[in-house]
Each structure stands twice: as structure tokens, then as C-alpha cells.
UniProtKB/Swiss-Prot annotation:
Cystine pairings recorded for this chain: C135-C138
Entry protein name: Thioredoxin-like 2-2, chloroplastic
GO MF annotation list: oxidoreductase activity, acting on a sulfur group of donors, disulfide as acceptor
InterPro entries per record: Thioredoxin-like_sf, Thioredoxin_CS, Thioredoxin_domain
Function comment: Thiol-disulfide oxidoreductase that may participate in various redox reactions. Possesses insulin disulfide bonds reducing activity.
Boundaries of every Thioredoxin domain copy: 83-220
Any one Pfam family match given in the protein's UniProt record, by short name: Thioredoxin
Length: 236
């Protein structure tokens, strides 16, 4: 009987120890939310499961509380930088073909700007190009015109967009593109012709600047000048 009593006492102690371990395991369970309920897994497998579990990959451990809290991960800084770079690239697009001017080329956007540019040129030779952004011949000729402008820095080149200045262009009888006008000081318009860069170079080289005559008499030039400004002021 004494042996039975001792066995019973040992069984009770074993049950208490088992209960204590169960309580301790239950207490640890919140600290390991990613572990599966299988208690036969060794510690290495538990660690691998813990690191590869989706819920653990988005958790952050807080030492102060001893618990893992599920917080959203911050977006990497590299993505933010990439967005800013793309925005800067969009803001700095290369200029259109008609915007690539030589230093002595001026864009004209109105009749007032046109008259002001002619007046400010003084006795310098002024070459006016009438063009269209949609004109294939204008686009093909433009790089050569820019080169000519660089080779003659004393000449003023004015660029008139036909679509932006239709009333003025029509009053000047500009009916084909590209079209060129030559002006100089009080002499007014000296010459006008369409398209050919060879004509532009020939007109420049006919006589040394500033005595550019182009085969036009002084009386003809004065008449042309007065007629031109009368037509311009009718637009205003």
C-alpha cells in the first residue's frame, strides 16, 4: 500500500510539472505568432518558419513591450528618388527644332515686336524668315540658316511664325514658306524671295555690308519702305 501511495504522489508531482510546462508554453505562444502548433519541430525549423512567414516579414519587434506589432513597411527611399528624377526629366525636354536659335536670331510673336526689332536694328542688315512649325522645307532649311547666322554675327535674323502672325504675314504677301525679307535701316525692305538658302547667301554677298544695294535704286527702296510701314500700321 505504501508503494501505491508513493506512486500516486509521484504521479501527482509529474502532473503538476507537466501543467507548469503547459502554462509556460501558453505564455510564450503570443511571442511566436508565426510558429505552427506542431511541438515536435526542432528549434532550427522553427527559426526558418519564423523568418519566412508572411506575417513575420511585416512585423516589427518592440523591446519595451516584448511583443511584435504589425506595422506597414516604409517605401524604400530609392523609389522616391526615382520619381523625382523622372519629374525633372519631364521638365527639361529638349527644345523643338525651331527653338534652337543662334545668338543673333530673334523670335517674333507680334506686329509690335516686329516693328520694334526693325527699329532697334539701326543700320544693320535684317533678314526675316517666315516659317511654319509644320513645314518640312522650313525644318530642312533651318540648320543651314542657323549656320549662316553664326557666320554673320553682324546681321540680325528675325523669325516669324506664320501661324502666330497670320494677319501680318498676309499683309506682307507671304504666301509660301519658307519666305525671306531683307531690311536695312531707313532703306526699308530691300529684297524678298522664297525658300532658297542660296539666294540668302547671294543677297548677303552681293556687296559689302553695310552698303548693301541688291540692284535696287535709292528711290525704289524709299518707296518700298514707306509702302511697307503703311501696310504694317494698318494691322495695328
Amino acid at each position: 500500500m505504501a508503494g501505491v501511495v508513493r506512486l500516486t504522489t509521484t504521479s501527482v508531482q509529474a502532473i503538476r510539472v507537466s501543467s507548469s510546462f503547459s502554462s509556460f508554453a501558453t505564455a510564450l505562444n503570443p511571442l511566436q505568432p508565426c510558429l505552427p502548433p506542431n511541438s515536435n519541430l526542432n528549434s532550427d525549423k522553427r527559426l526558418r518558419l519564423l523568418s519566412s512567414s508572411p506575417s513575420c516579414s511585416s512585423s516589427h519587434y518592440h523591446p519595451s513591450s516584448g511583443l511584435g506589432s504589425h506595422l506597414p513597411l516604409r517605401r524604400p527611399k530609392s523609389q522616391v528618388v526615382r520619381v523625382k528624377v523622372d519629374e525633372n526629366v519631364a521638365e527639361t525636354e529638349p527644345p523643338k527644332w525651331w527653338e534652337r536659335n543662334a545668338p543673333n536670331m530673334v523670335d517674333i510673336h507680334s506686329t509690335e515686336e516686329f516693328l520694334s526689332a526693325l527699329s532697334g536694328a539701326g543700320e544693320r542688315l535684317v533678314i526675316v524668315e517666315f516659317y511654319g512649325t509644320w513645314c518640312a522645307s522650313c525644318r530642312a532649311l533651318f540648320p543651314k540658316l542657323c549656320k549662316t547666322a553664326v557666320e554673320h554675327p553682324d546681321i540680325v535674323f528675325l523669325k516669324v511664325n506664320f501661324d502666330e502672325n497670320k494677319p501680318m504675314c498676309k499683309s506682307l504677301n507671304v504666301r509660301v514658306l519658307p519666305f525671306f525679307h531683307f531690311y536695312r535701316g531707313a532703306d526699308g525692305q530691300l529684297e524678298s524671295f522664297s525658300c532658297s538658302l542660296a539666294k540668302v547667301k547671294k543677297a548677303i554677298s552681293v556687296s559689302p555690308f553695310p552698303q548693301l544695294e541688291l540692284g535696287i535704286t535709292l528711290q525704289t527702296k524709299r518707296t518700298t519702305s514707306l509702302f511697307f510701314f503703311d501696310r504694317i500700321y494698318q494691322i495695328l
